[in-house]
Amino acid sequence: MKQFSEPGSVPFLEFGGEGESLFFAHANGYPPGSYDVLLQKLAAKLNVEGVEHRPLWSESRAPTFMPWQVYARDLLDRIEESGADSVWLVGHSMGAASAILAASEQPSRFKGIVALDPVLISNKAWFWSRLFARLKPDAMPIVKRALARPHEFANHRAAFEFYRGKRVFQRVSDSVLMDYVMAAHVARGGEQVHLRYSGEWEACVYRSVPRMSGALKRLKCPMLIVAGDRSDVLSAKTLNWASGLNSKIQVTTLSGGHLLPLEAPQACAEVALDFIQSNK
């Protein structure tokens, strides 16, 4: 895994591999390195690159709101910079939604999408969520948690122990959790480490969840939604709604929650590779 960052360009990580190009878009708060196990499995068959979302590299303070189309355009910019012709997209959570937005904007660039527990909400749910966020931007429970999260730890081990006790990570292995800790925290003098993806940016992403129905309808490439059977983001009703919008959308489920690609990276990789192979 090699990291690349140049002025004026979207930063990315190379995970190696040969063959067709695959670009990965990560979830809110989880840098590409968090998914090392998953992406190394994919790199056994494809040339894999993880694109960093704007909260990891922007020098600007997090705004209250920012359209997710901005992250989609960043993804498109990185793909164009790479010189790749037609690529596969894999994304998790907001990264999967950003991938869908990107593919709906420039369909000729993409061979297919694997969306791992993507953020998809119906138009009605989106309306009420957006209204509440506009009226009380810091009142949403998920926003409150993001703004309250600690940003400093004595060292990486202290950060690991903190997260190890959190319910959200209870089905994530120690090794994958450490991948997240190392990817999401940077040293700042001595051993002390600082959170790279600030709570303010995380909250901005949560407040700005987009309406997705139009993008789903406009998809031209095949897409597989891989949902966790214990996901608190995707319900059976939502999956039925999404798959009913476009005949190119398939749905499958795996054992796990919203952090499915961290909880079951091997299973996610196998499903993704099978889908890619069947759509070549």
Located regions from the model:
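The conserved beta1-alpha1 loop
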Residues: 23-27, 92, 227
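Flexible "cap/lid" loop of the alpha/beta hydrolase fold
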Residues: 111-152
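Conserved serine/cysteine hydrolase catalytic core
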Residues: 175, 184-244
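Catalytic histidine-centered segment of alpha/beta-hydrolase-like enzymes
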Residues: 256-265, 269
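Conserved hydrolase catalytic core segment
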Residues: 85-128
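Conserved HGGG/HGGXW glycine-rich cap/lid loop of the alpha/beta-hydrolase fold
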Residues: 14-61
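Active-site loop/oxyanion-hole signature of alpha/beta-hydrolase fold enzymes
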Residues: 49, 53-90, 129-131, 270
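A short loop-to-beta-strand scaffold at the N-terminal edge of the catalytic core in hydrolase folds
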Residues: 6-15
